[in-house]
């Protein structure tokens, strides 16, 4: 056996034996020489244990020369919750403590007050692991109050990642000036526009104008005015009544206006301090913070095509021809359906997965959301009606899984499952007028459109239905010119574009476009090859086609379906499809969506 392992095993055995023995002595009230009195409750303990675990109690019980102080057996502790101290004492003797969200901050404060580092560290670790939108500001403030840099920095970074959302919370308006400045000053703020920072500061000031106006000059140094559009600066910043009333702020604004014209204040050499020699601390003074034009972390966002398969989610930048790893995806089943919402949230649902350990419900329809901050998939409640060949739509905070094939009966469905992203619950909503599978779904202005598909008798449809969730109503609209199933569909520049697919005549390359205002379908530029299962994506104002299946000559010289992994772009001025990449290996077996992601946060492939 490895000597280090033997040593660790012996240490663990001895510490366990010692701890069990000490707990037994406490339970049997043996060698007890101290009582902590809190209100009307008393807690027996051992001075030696308290002194060993806490510098506070060591100083209380012993003098600097190591002699025991004669302070009596009873130690009175004021302003302490006896239940909290009881939990801490039990931890010191057993290494067990039941931390929950409701008690951790109070335990943390008591451990800090009485200098009990073991409990303190356990609480810090718990709070770091449990950081959430609900507690991040409280944890940040706690870390500052108790002077715990590790916790304050972890909470600050969490808030910086989600600044736009956190800054809209009521608790944000309660921050002290030094707390606000600690959040908004850094490069790591995840905001796409500096307007968000300016508006959050002014909202914070107005929440307590009488007391906070005096802090605005300091907050100004954290706002990067040169990153604001000049039009916004003129219309929103210069006209603000609070700013106009402060001569000091107006001087700073004049420097910003000069900077917009290309005139920056001269950088003066740093003054030498007494004792410095040439070469030490040389350089120029930095520009004031309000003239800082370094981009924040969130300003590196790009419109990307995200390809998700059962191996990874890869984001492709068409303009730069670069790929980034958005997340590994081993837990994502094949043949899932993906959707990127208006709020830029990526969800994937379904895929064929058989849980052999579950006898009651072996077929599972898993459900994940991409956490772009941690580059990981967050598991959500599985869809209760396992199905394949369905599709997804959205309306406000609701997702809709529409029709498809039942995984157990293999029959087409008309049911529509609805997931509330705020309540985190699935429910069933108004059924589709038809039983179909292999259809496409798009969303526009909080309405959900179900297009084409196949019935159980293998007949391709040209019908289109629109769903209004507020009215719980499906309504039939104009039909496509060509019946089709397993085709690409996307909303691009305010119109629906469909291309490819399969019908009774085989694969098709025909494309169509739908005008929402006139309720009419028109012919769109035909795709260069007959294909099914095409991924149509609208990204950065451009239309792309990724992959699909075509009938080609196979390696054995027979003719059959084969997956294609190329990328095409539609050139609007020429009204033609232009080939961009002959092969994109990450597109194999992938669903594809257009999504805005931060390239600075993802490893480049």
UniProtKB/Swiss-Prot annotation:
Domain of life assignment: Eukaryota
CDD domains assigned: BACK_KLHL41_KBTBD10, BTB_POZ_KLHL41_KBTBD10
Annotated GO biological process: proteasome-mediated ubiquitin-dependent protein catabolic process; regulation of sarcomere organization; sarcomere organization; skeletal muscle fiber development; swimming behavior
InterPro entries documented for this protein: BACK, BTB-kelch_protein, BTB/POZ_dom, Kelch-typ_b-propeller, Kelch_1, KLHL41_KL41B_BTB_POZ_dom, SKP1/BTB/POZ_sf
Keywords of this entry: Cytoplasm, Cytoskeleton, Endoplasmic reticulum, Kelch repeat, Membrane, Repeat, Sarcoplasmic reticulum
The BACK domain, residue ranges: 136-238
Subcellular location: Cytoplasm; Cytoplasm, Cytoskeleton; Sarcoplasmic reticulum membrane; Endoplasmic reticulum membrane
Kelch repeats: 345-397, 398-446, 447-494, 496-541, 543-598
GO cellular component, one term: cytoplasm
Disruption phenotype: Knockdown of klhl41b result in reduced disorganized muscle without any other significant abnormalities. Knockdown of both genes (klhl41a and klhl41b) is lethal by 3 dpf. Double knockdown fish exhibit severely disorganized muscle compared to controls and either of the single knockdowns.
Coiled coil: none
BTB domain location: 32-102
UniProt GO molecular function: ubiquitin-like ligase-substrate adaptor activity
Role played: Involved in skeletal muscle development and maintenance.
Entry protein name: Kelch-like protein 41b
Origin species: Danio rerio (Zebrafish)
């Amino acid at each position: 056996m490895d000597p280090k392992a033997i040593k660790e095993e012996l240490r663990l055995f001895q510490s366990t034996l010692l701890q069990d023995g000490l707990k037994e002595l406490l339970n049997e009230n043996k060698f007890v020489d101290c009582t902590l009195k809190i209100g009307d409750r008393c807690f027996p303990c051992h001075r030696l244990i308290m002194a060993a675990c806490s510098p506070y109690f060591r100083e209380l019980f012993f003098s600097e020369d190591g002699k025991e102080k004669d302070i009596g057996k009873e130690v009175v502790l004021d302003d302490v919750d006896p239940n909290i101290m009881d939990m801490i004492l039990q931890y010191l003797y057993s290494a067990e403590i039941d931390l929950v969200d409701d008690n951790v901050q109070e335990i943390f404060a008591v451990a800090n007050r009485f200098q009990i580092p073991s409990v303190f560290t356990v609480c810090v670790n718990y709070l770091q692991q449990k950081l959430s939108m609900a507690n991040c500001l409280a944890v940040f403030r706690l870390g500052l109050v108790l002077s715990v840099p590790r916790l304050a920095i972890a909470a600050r970074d969490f808030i910086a990642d989600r600044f736009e959302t956190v800054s809209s919370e009521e608790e944000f308006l309660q921050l002290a000036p030094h707390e606000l400045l600690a959040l908004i000053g850094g490069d790591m703020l995840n905001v796409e526009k500096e307007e968000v920072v300016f508006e959050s500061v002014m909202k914070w000031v107005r929440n307590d104008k009488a007391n906070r106006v005096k802090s605005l000059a300091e907050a100004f140094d954290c706002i990067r005015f040169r990153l604001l559009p000049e039009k916004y600066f003129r219309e929103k910043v210069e006209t603000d009544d609070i700013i106009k009333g402060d001569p000091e702020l107006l001087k700073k604004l004049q420097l910003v206006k000069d900077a917009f014209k290309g005139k920056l204040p001269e950088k003066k050499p740093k003054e030498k301090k007494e004792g410095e020699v040439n070469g030490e601390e040389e350089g120029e003074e930095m520009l004031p913070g309000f003239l800082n034009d370094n981009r924040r972390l969130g300003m590196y966002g790009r419109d990307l095509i995200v390809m998700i398969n059962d191996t990874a989610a890869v984001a492709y930048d068409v303009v730069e021809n670069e790929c980034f790893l958005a997340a590994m995806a081993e837990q994502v089943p094949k043949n899932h359906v993906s959707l990127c919402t208006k709020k830029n949230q990526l969800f994937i649902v379904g895929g064929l997965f058989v849980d052999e350990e579950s006898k009651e419900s072996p077929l599972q329809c898993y459900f994940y959301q991409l956490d772009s901050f941690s580059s990981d998939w967050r598991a959500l409640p599985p869809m209760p009606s396992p199905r394949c060949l369905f599709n997804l739509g959205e309306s406000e905070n609701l997702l809709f899984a529409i029709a498809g094939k039942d995984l157990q009966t293999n029959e087409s469905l008309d049911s529509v499952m609805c997931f509330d992203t705020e309540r985190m619950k699935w429910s069933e909503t108004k059924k589709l007028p038809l039983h179909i599978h292999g259809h496409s779904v798009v969303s526009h202005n909080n309405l959900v459109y179900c297009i084409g598909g196949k019935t159980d008798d293998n007949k391709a449809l040209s019908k289109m239905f629109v769903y209004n969730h507020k009215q719980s109503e499906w309504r039939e609209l104009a039909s496509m010119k060509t019946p089709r199933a397993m085709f690409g569909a996307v909303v691009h520049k305010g119109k629906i574009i469909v291309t490819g697919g399969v019908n009774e005549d085989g694969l098709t390359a025909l494309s169509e476009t739908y005008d929402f205002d006139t309720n009419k379908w028109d012919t769109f530029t035909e795709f260069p090859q007959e294909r099914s299962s095409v991924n149509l994506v609208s990204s950065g104002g451009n239309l792309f086609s990724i992959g699909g299946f075509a009938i080609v000559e196979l390696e054995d010289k027979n003719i059959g379906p084969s997956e294609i992994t190329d990328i095409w772009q539609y050139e609007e001025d020429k009204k033609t499809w232009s080939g961009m990449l002959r092969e994109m290996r990450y597109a194999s077996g992938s669903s594809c969506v257009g999504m805005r992601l931060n390239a600075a946060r993802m490893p480049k492939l």
